[in-house]
Amino acid sequence: MASLDRVKVLVLGDSGVGKSSLVHLLCHNQVLGNPSWTVGCSVDIRVHDYKEGTPEEKTYYIELWDVGGSVGSASSVKSTRAVFYNSVNGIILVHDLTNKKSSQNLYRWSLEVLNRDAVPTGVLVTNGDYDREQFADNQIPLLVIGTKLDQIHETKRHEVLIRTAFLAEDFNAEEINLDCTNPRSSAAGSSNAVKLSRFFDKVIEKRYFFREGNQIPGFSDRKRFGGGALKNFHCD
C-alpha cells in the first residue's frame, strides 16, 4: 500500500476504563481477548476513508495513542508522559460508565495535555470543580467515549446517560457510549460508527485543511470548557 497521510489522536483516561479494548475494537473490529495494563504508550493504526462516498474521499491513517498511567501520578511521571502529547491532532477521552470518578478525571487528563506548554485559564480547585473560564486558542477536536455500557442496569441507564450527556456538553464534544466486548457497538452503519467517522473527518480537516501545514494547539470550536454541568456533578 502506498504511503498515506496520517493524523495523531490521543486516547486518554484512567487505568482500567477499557482504552486498550476500545482501541483494538476501533482498529481491528474485533474484541480484545486478554487486555493488559498499558505501560507508557501503545500505538495502533486505524484506516479511515475521509468523506467516504464523496468526490473528496481519501484514505488516511489514524494513529491511536493509548496513553497509560494515572492522572494522579507524580509530577516526574507526568513530565515523562508529556512527550506523547506533542503534535496532537485529536483527543478521545475515555471513561467507565460504572465509575463516576473516571468521568470526573477526564477534566484533569485534558488539563494535563493543555498544560504541557502553558498554564490555561481554567484551574482545578480542591473540591474537584473547575473554573468556567475559557481556554484560549484551543482547537483540538474531542470525542468523549463511555465504556462498559453493558454493565449498567436498565433501571440506572437513564440516570447514567444524562450524566454523560452533561459531561460531553462541558467539552462541547459528541459522545459515544458502548460495550467494547460487542463488535456491533461500532459496526458500519450504526450511530456510533457515524459519530466516529464524523470525528475523524474533523481531525483530518483541522490537520490538513483548516490551517495548511500547521499544528493546531487546542480544542476545537470551544465556547467554554471545564465548568458547565460539572458544577452539579460530583463523585460520591
UniProtKB/Swiss-Prot annotation:
PROSITE patterns: RAB. One of its GO terms (molecular function) is GTP binding. One of its GO terms (biological process) is B cell differentiation. Disruption phenotype: Embryonic lethal. Residues 1-235 are annotated as: Small GTPase-like. The keyword RNA-binding does not apply. PANTHER family: DRAB5-RELATED. Belongs to the small GTPase superfamily. Rab family. This is Rab-like protein 3. The lineage of its organism: Eukaryota, Metazoa, Chordata, Craniata, Vertebrata.
